[in-house]
Design a protein with these regions (language model features):
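Short Gly/Thr/Asp-enriched flexible loops that form oxyanion-binding sites at enzyme active sites
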Residues: 1-6, 156-175, 211
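Gly/Ser/Thr-rich loops at beta-strand to alpha-helix junctions
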Residues: 85-91, 155-157, 206-209, 315-316, ...
């Protein structure tokens, strides 16, 4: 397939996509269609190639997002990072942006700086998968740097790895990276005088609630959207056209970040530049991003998230997915892993049910096949079918009094989620329980 963008530069929102699909049903697409030699079409101006001029305009906007050249300059002699584009198109503009920022010690992974759609050095070029960073980790250890940056092949998503207190590199999740960047941007924009009136942050409904805590604790409103940047772009347009707010940052847990007014989609070039500026700023404070993340947990609370995929392959997969969602609606759980469900939300029709009082209400968001369960201990469980693969995605958003408590609670719900049936059943199921288990002796961050 392919992506279609509207005049504002964003992917088509559902209403426009539906209108185009409806129009396609009204025409015979072969009527009047002519073929033409590519070179002839190019010569006649029927094909327009985007060239260096487009890159220059884009990069001018990217560098206009810089908040703190001075701090980068102060640490530039000692601060360094490793970068990999995973054989993709980030190999050109990401290093250009970081060099323009003032980074002197940018260490690329040479084997992965070559565009190659076979991705010969990795099993998967997805920055969500830490296994792909093995070459970058070796390079970072040899060069004694604490920060690794990796962009996916089409350079719209970015993942980072940071050195922990044991000297090893660990991945920072999309949820955590977004929280780090949001908190940094709020401070940096205030320090540089760039903070607009009525600032707003956007996140998806399946992204950590820690983002809301960070935003609202610093005077920034936070709104939820459905998964996908077409919805974030639509919300950004609506808020700014109405004068209700100015969006300073939008992100989702799957490593996508939207910044500025010149892009209405996730953009790894701008995100990479600002993540590097952030890492340099913390370096000037004597902190790594691992230190910074722990400081944010100490300040805002210990949050923990986990996503689990219930894969339903084969010819029956789509049917089983639909049946499971239907079963959850008709026989909603009253408890999950021994904890009471206090609020149920169905984003299909926007309905909200208070399970304690029985009161019913409506929320603003509706029109997406997602179920949300809010539990007595503050945990949120969301369930939705994937739009592209034969699987049900289950999101666990929880928190605890400290790192161990948050991780333990996440593990408890994760074990329950793993036991959810791939095959829906008809008997009434009011309790979702995890099997008997023993807490681990140590809980990783």
């Amino acid at each position: 397939g392919y992506k279609v963008y509207w005049a504002d530069g964003a992917q088509l929102p559902p209403q426009h996509a539906a209108a185009i699909a409806d129009e396609l049903t009204r025409i015979d697409i072969f009527t009047g269609v002519r073929s033409m030699d590519y070179e002839q079409a190019l010569a006649e101006g029927r094909i327009e190639l985007l060239g260096e001029d487009c890159d220059r305009r884009f990069m001018a906007n990217v560098m206009g997002m810089v908040n703190d050249y001075e701090t980068v300059k102060k640490v530039a002699d000692d601060f360094g990072l490793v970068y990999t584009p995973f054989h993709g198109c980030g190999y050109k503009l990401v290093p250009e942006a970081l060099t323009a920022l003032g980074i002197k010690h940018l260490i690329p992974v040479p084997e992965q700086m070559v565009i190659d759609g076979n991705f010969p050095t990795v099993v998967s070029p997805n920055p969500e998968n830490p296994e792909g960073f093995y070459l970058a980790i070796d390079l970072a250890k040899k060069n004694d740097v604490d920060f690794i940056l990796g962009t996916d092949p089409d350079s719209d998503r970015v993942g980072i790895m940071v050195r922990n207190h044991e000297g090893e590199f660990q991945p920072v999740t999309g949820n955590q990276t977004g929280v780090l960047l949001l908190d940094y941007l709020i401070g940096a924009m205030k320090r540089s005088g760039k903070m607009p009136a009525n600032p707003v942050a956007l996140k998806t409904i399946v992204t950590t609630e820690m983002a809301r805590k960070v935003a609202e604790s610093n005077g920034v409103k936070c709104f939820d959207t459905f998964t996908g940047f077409k919805f974030m772009a639509e919300k950004k347009n609506a808020l700014e056209e109405s004068g209700e707010g100015k969006v300073i940052f939008s992100y989702e847990e799957s490593y996508g970040y939207m910044l500025g007014d010149y892009v209405r989609d996730k953009d790894a070039v701008t995100a990479s530049m600002l993540l590097t500026e952030m890492a340099a700023w913390y370096d000037a404070q004597g902190m790594t991003l691992f230190d910074a993340l722990n400081a944010l947990y100490e300040k805002y609370g210990w949050y923990a998230e986990k996503t689990h995929n219930l894969v339903m392959p084969g010819l029956d997969g789509l049917r089983d997915m639909a049946k499971l969602m239907k079963d959850l609606r008709e026989n909603p759980p009253t408890e999950i892993s021994g904890v009471k469900v206090i609020v149920r939300k169905d984003y299909t029709d926007g309905s909200v049910i208070d399970c304690v009082t029985g009161a019913k209400s409506r929320m603003e968001l509706s029109g997406s096949n997602v179920l949300r369960y809010e539990l007595e201990d503050g945990t949120v469980i969301l369930v939705r079918p994937s739009g592209t693969e034969p699987k049900i995605k289950v999101y666990i958003l929880t928190q605890g009094a400290d790192a161990a408590a948050a991780s333990l609670r996440r593990l408890r719900y994760f074990m329950m989620v793993r036991t959810m049936p791939r095959k829906p059943h008809s008997p009434r199921r009011t309790v979702l329980s995890s099997p008997e288990w023993e807490p681990p002796h140590s809980i990783p961050m």
